[in-house]
């Protein structure tokens, strides 16, 4: 079984699947935006079987394009309705939350005050000192854009025009803000927040900020590609993962995230590392339907600040 995943850390989980089923697994690391572009380019003959991780907007778009295979299993009833497709085309294995990451030394050197809210990031003191990932390739940062547009309504694009004035670089990977703030290239990163970020903060004298006006969040998807060569194995993996809490706990440990508790509240042995009230109110149905329109407008805004390699 061939898998496209958002990282190469999932080996132990897939090894457990191989141990249980005898199905060997080959993993290729790729962001959700890249997967969607590749899937469309392949014209209905996917080179992989299973899509594991990435922002749910890309999964919604893939479903609309007829590129996914539905998977139905009894344990899906234990997952929150908003975290699974009603027709079984995708399921969420957790959520990614987003906040700010500050390089304390650089902030002090530049005389910057710590931002506390999304609006604070538009202050001119941060000009050239903010980094975020390109929302066209990072599902997490697309969620930031969509969530803030929902929250700010008619003023949403004015906000991003102002924010763009302070952003120096739009990275190609979701980890770029963490890496570039940790190395001291930039003072402020708009970044996912998980245990790996907490560890980086401790090791590199960084501060994590949970925005006072709410944290954007995005469900992370799992799906099977339509017309996949090993479609039955991929469908069984989805059932295998969600039907056994031990597998979900192993996944949470690998990812160093507690978001599966939001997806499946009945799971034991996992506690959320943040209060749910910090999460922004989001209409997830808009994540997929608005994706093309939003990215078409955001791309020229980024200009030559977007990473190309």
Where are these regions (language model features)?
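Extracytoplasmic ligand-binding site segments that recognize negatively charged/polar headgroups
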Residues: 4-11, 30-34, 46-185
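A ligand-binding cleft/hinge motif common to bilobed small-molecule-binding domains
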Residues: 57-61, 182, 187-205, 254
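Short beta-strand->loop
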Residues: 68-77, 90-92, 119, 204-216, ...
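Conserved C-terminal helix/tail region of periplasmic/extracytoplasmic solute-binding proteins
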Residues: 280-309
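A bilobed periplasmic-binding-protein/Venus flytrap-type ligand-binding module shared by bacterial periplasmic
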Residues: 101-106, 146-149, 218-230, 250-253
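Periplasmic-binding protein-like
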Residues: 125-133, 159-164, 170-171, 202-226, 241-264
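Short, polar/charged alpha-helical segment
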Residues: 2-26, 100, 200
């Amino acid at each position: 079984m061939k898998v496209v995943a958002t990282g190469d850390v999932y080996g132990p989980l897939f090894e457990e699947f191989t141990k249980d089923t005898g199905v060997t697994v080959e993993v290729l690391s790729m962001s959700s935006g890249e997967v969607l572009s590749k899937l469309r380019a392949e014209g209905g003959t996917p080179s992989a079987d299973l899509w594991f991780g990435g922002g749910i907007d890309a999964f919604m778009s893939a479903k609309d394009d007829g590129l996914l295979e539905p998977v139905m299993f009894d344990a899906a009833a234990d997952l929150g309705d908003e975290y699974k497709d009603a027709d079984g085309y995708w399921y969420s294995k957790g959520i990614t939350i987003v906040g700010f990451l500050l390089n304390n030394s650089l902030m002090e050197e530049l005389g910057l005050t710590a931002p506390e809210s999304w609006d604070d990031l538009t202050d001119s003191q941060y000009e050239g000192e903010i980094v975020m990932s390109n929302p066209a390739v990072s599902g997490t940062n697309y969620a930031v854009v969509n969530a803030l547009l929902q929250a700010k309504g008619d003023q949403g694009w004015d906000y991003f025009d102002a924010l763009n004035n302070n952003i120096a670089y739009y990275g190609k990977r979701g980890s770029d803000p963490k890496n570039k703030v940790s190395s001291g290239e930039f003072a402020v990163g708009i970044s996912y927040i998980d245990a790996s970020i907490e560890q980086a903060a401790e090791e590199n004298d960084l501060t994590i900020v949970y925005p006072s006006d709410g944290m954007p969040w995005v469900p992370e998807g799992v799906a099977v590609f339509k017309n996949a060569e090993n479609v039955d194995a991929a469908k069984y993996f989805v059932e295998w993962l969600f039907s056994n809490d031990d597998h979900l706990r192993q996944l949470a440990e690998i990812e160093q995230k507690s978001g599966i508790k939001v997806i499946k509240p009945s799971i034991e042995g996992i506690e959320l590392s943040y209060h749910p009230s910090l999460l922004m109110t989001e209409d997830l149905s808009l994540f997929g339907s608005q994706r093309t329109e939003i990215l078409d407008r955001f791309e020229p805004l980024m200009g030559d600040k977007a990473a190309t390699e």
